[in-house]
A protein has these predicted regions:
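ATP-binding N-lobe of GHMP and related small-molecule kinases
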Residues: 1-92, 110-120, 146, 155, ...
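ATP-dependent small-molecule kinase catalytic core of the GHMP/sugar-kinase superfamily
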Residues: 1-4, 9-27, 114-223
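A short, mixed-charge helix-start or loop-turn motif at secondary-structure junctions
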Residues: 50, 97, 196-197
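Glycine/serine-rich anion-binding loops at beta->alpha junctions
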Residues: 85-112, 130, 223-230
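Charge-dense, low-complexity intrinsically disordered segments
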Residues: 58, 95, 205
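A short, flexible low-complexity segment enriched in Lys/Arg and Gly/Pro that occurs
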Residues: 65-79, 105-106, 194-213
């Protein structure tokens, strides 16, 4: 069994829109001790057999099956049974799907002794999702570009209380809602480390008033931040 950890954005600044349709961003990501579990077993069918306890995940097309397809197109690998025990809520801003994809790449690399270096695995993972390279790397990192620039940083040990409203917020929809007035100028690393700004927060709060009320109530108890796109 492999743990597939969630992440938090300690801040998330959107800088501009790229010609390829992605956005340039700056963020501080850190892994937290909250995780899904994936199990892997070779099979003789030369196909992927994917199952999960979540009825919200399309069992034929998701980031785990996409990760398997990417590797099977590049390397001659056998079939695998994969079971995903889902605990990280979908659409929660915690990167669960990207983490699942990264763990799948790492597991297939080990199971089939493909000897793909971490740098190459991170490069391969860019085609699966913008956050996947970070999860290949793990730890805490400065994230730049479209998510493909991952530089390790040191973050003091912190404790977080996760509040998970019963909402599913689409990353695609949130990026589509961005306009140039939401873009930010580039910060230094020290400024970024001290920031609690999330470029998506105003958009999310305007679309989901209940979330705005929740943040207002929680702010009486300490620093409140939003992770990811919600």
């Amino acid at each position: 069994n492999c743990k597939s950890f969630a992440k938090l954005n300690l801040c998330l600044h959107i800088l501009d829109r790229r010609k390829d349709g992605y956005h340039n961003l700056e963020s501080i990501f850190c892994i937290i001790d909250f995780y899904d579990t994936l199990s892997f077993q070779k099979n003789n069918s030369n196909k992927l057999n994917f199952q999960t306890n979540s009825n919200e995940i399309d069992s034929t097309y998701n980031l785990v099956t996409k990760a398997y397809s990417v590797i099977s197109n590049l390397y001659d690998i056998e079939g695998v049974d994969i079971y995903l025990d889902k605990k990280i809520p979908i659409g929660s801003g915690l990167g669960g799907g990207s983490s699942n994809a990264a763990v799948t790449l790492l597991a297939l690399n080990e199971i089939f002794k493909l000897n793909i270096s971490k740098d190459n695995l991170m490069k391969i993972s860019e085609d699966i999702g913008a956050d996947v390279p970070f999860f290949i790397n793990g730890g805490a990192a400065y994230i730049g570009g479209k998510g493909d620039i991952v530089n390790n940083i040191s973050v003091d040990k912190k404790y977080f209380v996760l509040i998970l409203p019963n909402l599913k917020i689409s990353t695609k929809d949130m990026y589509a809602s961005l306009s140039s007035k939401d873009f930010m100028t580039q910060y230094s690393l020290d400024e970024l480390m001290a920031s609690n700004i999330n470029s998506f927060e105003k958009i999310v709060m305007s679309k989901y008033p209940s979330l705005k009320e929740t943040k207002y109530w929680l702010s009486a108890f300490g620093s409140v931040r939003m992770s990811g796109t919600g």
